[in-house]
């Protein structure tokens, strides 16, 4: 089920499979829904804290239940490849690494009962001390090994200058099916002794994980500037814009919805049938690149007043048992598995 209020929930259909990593954002417990981690000042940006800046990340999620669950959280420091590091808590955290989630509210007048939970990082109990990759894990008080949900975030220090250029004139075609990225990284203030070999650069296309690129070395170095150009890893398929849909009401069909039906005990949003666009001309559409926002047409408090509905997707294409179709976006947590 998808929360009624998932407005501008952008969809991108992909025909390839991807295994889910153990440290990816996800909800192993099927009762946990609508997991989000955002900077409230930049809700469509990546989950990033600037060390010592006063930035805050807000974590919000629902648990399908009529009763409150006693939940706790912890932070895991990770290496560049998102594997857990060997640092002890006191080396990367100020405060206590395990805390109780006490901010919760019950859903109001919804067919599907749920409890909405909120948490902020940093808070009065804990704050990151080091830049790097972090994993926030949520688990029941009675069983710390049973992770119900986890989400990635990053803590950064602005020690390098980064400039980039995206071009449609690429090493393989011109204004056709690819885009090529060039990067320049000024390391003069970084304090890195050997930036040519010691910097690990990760590039994502609109937050996607399936084609994420990790660069170990630049093409060349000019003074203190690392130059990444004409590198095959930075050549991306251009693709199309994400598909958009809204499920903000059960009283009328919102954007992208063909009909709304009630089939006891749930409302169903039947989306308009879509089709593959790989062979179609590119059409610009202002989307949020797979992000979603919780909203409900008649509510001023959608976090607890928006209902969950069943959303029916359909893709008009010849059947091929060798092709798997996935929905990509933040609402599927960028995972290509049985839930997407």
PLM-predicted stretches and their roles:
Residues 155-178:
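Low-complexity, Pro/Ser/Thr- and charge-rich linker/hinge segments at domain boundaries
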Residues 93-117, 209-218, 312-340:
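Aromatic-rich carbohydrate-binding modules that target alpha-glucans
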Residues 195-280:
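Long, internal scaffold/assembly segments composed of regular secondary structure
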Residues 1-23:
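Bacterial Sec-dependent N-terminal signal peptides
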Residues 111-141:
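Ligand-binding face of N-terminal immunoglobulin V-set domains in extracellular IgSF glycoproteins
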Residues 28-77, 174-187, 300-313:
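Contiguous beta-strand segments within globular domains
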């Amino acid at each position: 089920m998808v929360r009624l209020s998932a407005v501008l929930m952008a969809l991108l259909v992909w025909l390839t499979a991807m295994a889910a990593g153990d440290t990816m954002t996800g909800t192993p417990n099927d009762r946990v829904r609508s997991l989000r981690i955002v900077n409230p000042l930049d809700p469509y940006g990546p989950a990033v804290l600037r060390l010592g800046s006063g930035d805050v990340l807000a974590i919000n999620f629902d648990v399908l239940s009529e009763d409150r669950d006693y939940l706790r959280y912890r932070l895991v420091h990770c290496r560049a490849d998102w594997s857990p590091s060997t640092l002890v808590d006191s080396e990367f955290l100020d405060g206590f690494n395990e805390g109780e989630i006490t901010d919760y509210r019950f859903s109001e007048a919804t067919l599907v009962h749920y409890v909405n939970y909120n948490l902020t990082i940093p808070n009065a109990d804990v704050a990151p001390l080091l830049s790097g990759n972090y994993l926030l894990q949520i688990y029941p008080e009675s069983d710390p090994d049973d992770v119900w949900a986890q989400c990635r975030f990053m803590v950064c220090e602005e020690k390098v200058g980064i400039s980039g250029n995206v071009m449609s004139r690429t090493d393989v075609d011109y204004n056709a099916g690819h885009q090529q990225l060039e990067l320049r990284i000024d390391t003069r203030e970084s304090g890195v002794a050997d930036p040519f070999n010691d910097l690990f650069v990760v590039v994502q296309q609109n937050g996607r994980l399936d084609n994420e690129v990790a660069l170990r070395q630049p093409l060349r170095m000019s003074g203190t500037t690392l130059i990444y150009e004409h590198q095959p890893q930075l050549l991306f398929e251009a693709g199309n814009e994400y598909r958009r849909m809204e499920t903000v009401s059960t009283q009328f069909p919102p954007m992208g919805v063909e009909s709304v039906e009630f089939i006891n005990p749930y409302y169903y949003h039947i989306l308009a049938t879509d089709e593959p666009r790989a062979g179609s001309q590119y059409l610009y559409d202002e989307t949020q690149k797979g992000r979603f926002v919780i909203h409900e047409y008649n509510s001023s408090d959608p976090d607890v007043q928006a209902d969950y509905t069943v959303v029916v997707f359909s893709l008009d294409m010849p059947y091929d048992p060798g092709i798997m179709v996935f929905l990509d976006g933040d609402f599927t947590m960028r995972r290509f598995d049985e839930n997407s």
